[in-house]
């Protein structure tokens, strides 16, 4: 499965490391979704410069040259790497096209603290799942969570294009999601529980 979930602060294994500051362009053959949890950094993406700080979301398309120009000492990011093959395997070309449009028109955006926490919880869950033994159910669960993660990015970016204050604009779906996630975390369910529900 062409997906990896990692960060730059916990020592998680990385299959594409772009965190060093050396002024040299890096290029990944996959989509990178980056969420800034702390600190700030300046990214050079092709010929444009983007600055992100806590609560900012950044999408970098596959085969796009970029590098980190500078970052603060407390710069923490969550990263999701999604290979193009995942979109074809999950039969979700609509999501792929929406992401391509957003990357071209609005690759970065600020999100509310509630959304930031939601993304971090999804990221943490996926990081654990990717360490589990791979099978049909695990892969299905990961696929669906990745789609939620990326569709939510589309939702946020679409919503805030015309919203006067994006950090105050919340939807009922977000509240419902938090309630469900909190319930699952409190009961500490195992992978087998999810598999039995699907199967």
Regions found by a protein language model. Give the residues of each.
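A hydrophobic/aromatic-rich effector-binding and dimerization subdomain
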Residues: 2-5, 69-132
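Histidine-centered metal-chelating micro-motifs
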Residues: 58, 62-68, 86-87
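A short, compositionally biased micro-patch
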Residues: 36-38, 61, 71
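Amphipathic, well-ordered alpha-helical segments in soluble domains
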Residues: 32-35, 118-125, 145, 149-152
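Generic protein-terminus/edge-of-domain signal
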Residues: 1-53
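Tight coil/turn sites that cap or link beta-strands
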Residues: 19, 54-55, 63, 83
């Amino acid at each position: 499965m062409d997906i990896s979930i990692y960060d730059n602060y916990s020592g998680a294994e990385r299959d594409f490391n772009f965190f060093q500051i050396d002024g040299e362009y890096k290029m990944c053959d996959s989509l990178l979704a980056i969420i800034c949890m702390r600190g700030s950094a300046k990214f050079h993406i092709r010929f444009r410069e983007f600055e992100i700080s806590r609560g900012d979301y950044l999408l970098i398309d596959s085969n796009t040259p970029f590098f980190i120009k500078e970052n603060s000492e407390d710069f923490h990011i969550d990263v999701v790497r999604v290979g193009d093959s995942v979109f074809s395997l999950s039969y979700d070309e609509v999501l792929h096209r929406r992401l391509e449009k957003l990357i071209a028109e609005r690759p970065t955006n600020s999100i509310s603290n509630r959304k930031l926490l939601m993304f971090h919880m999804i990221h943490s869950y996926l990081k654990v799942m990717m360490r589990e033994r791979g099978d049909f159910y695990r892969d299905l669960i990961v696929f669906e969570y990745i789609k939620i993660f990326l569709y939510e990015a589309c939702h946020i970016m679409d919503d805030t294009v015309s919203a006067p204050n994006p950090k105050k604009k919340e939807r009922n779906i977000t509240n419902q999601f938090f309630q469900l996630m909190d319930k699952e975390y409190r009961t500490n369910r195992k992978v087998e529980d999810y598999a039995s529900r699907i199967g």
